[in-house]
From Swiss-Prot:
Pathway named in the protein's UniProt entry: Carbohydrate degradation; pentose phosphate pathway; D-ribose 5-phosphate from D-ribulose 5-phosphate (non-oxidative stage): step 1/1
HAMAP family named among the record's database cross-references: Rib_5P_isom_A
Family: Belongs to the ribose 5-phosphate isomerase family.
Keyword Amino-acid biosynthesis attached: no
Source organism phylogeny: Bacteria, Pseudomonadati, Pseudomonadota, Alphaproteobacteria, Hyphomicrobiales
Domain of life: Bacteria
InterPro entries: NagB/RpiA_transferase-like, Ribose-5P_isomerase, Ribose5P_isomerase_typA_subgr, Ribose5P_isomerase_type_A
Organism: Brucella melitensis biotype 1 (strain ATCC 23456 / CCUG 17765 / NCTC 10094 / 16M)
Active site: 106
KW Isomerase (keyword) present: yes
Purpose: Catalyzes the reversible conversion of ribose-5-phosphate to ribulose 5-phosphate.
Protein name: Ribose-5-phosphate isomerase A
Binding site for substrate: 29-32, 84-87, 97-100, 124
Amino acid sequence: MDEARKLKIAAAAEALTYVKDGMRLGIGTGSTAEEFVRLLAEKVKGGFRVIGVPTSERTAKLCEELGVALTTLEETPHLDLTIDGADEVDGELSLIKGGGGALLREKIVAAASDSMIVIADQSKVVETLGRFPLPIEVNRFGLGATIRAIEAAAVKCGLAGPLNLRLKDGSPFLTDGGHYIVDASFGRIPDPKTLSDALFAIPGVVEHGLFIELARAAIIAGTDGIRTMNRS
């Protein structure tokens, strides 16, 4: 097993200690979240009772294969806890998420939860967000106009950089909701809240990967052990 996976498993195992019998869980998307699902499934086999809302079809499939009971936000609109990964996390626990393409559902599930705990390895911790391209989920209609509006909004925030339509097998990547994703390489984002507000003002933007004031804690695994970051 490579070192990166060991760290993901270590963070997932620590997060599992926050999960109590009978909880309603939001279950994230991505490689670290999948390690959490595998560990959770082992506890479920031993009689541990939880019910989860998956943030993607991929996560739902893994939960079903491993025997983790699932529900929906229609049936269970209020969740106790969401466990999810992140592409970047800063000292204020602002996040960039969406590298796996599930940012809309991830944000809906996180917002429906009493708290959100992020699991990641040390490489995801940054001083300022923006090293990882910011995923922006957009409506397929009017793509060119939406990209132009994103560029203009970024300039007003003092940002600029390439906007690339995400592709998969040579065709535009489609989210579970049927939308496109534009990956924005703005570089450092010193004021995530201002950028967030500017993006939400664009009609063609469905959601973006800035998660602000959603995470309560981040469990970070490094070669020197586990540490927990808490939002001030």
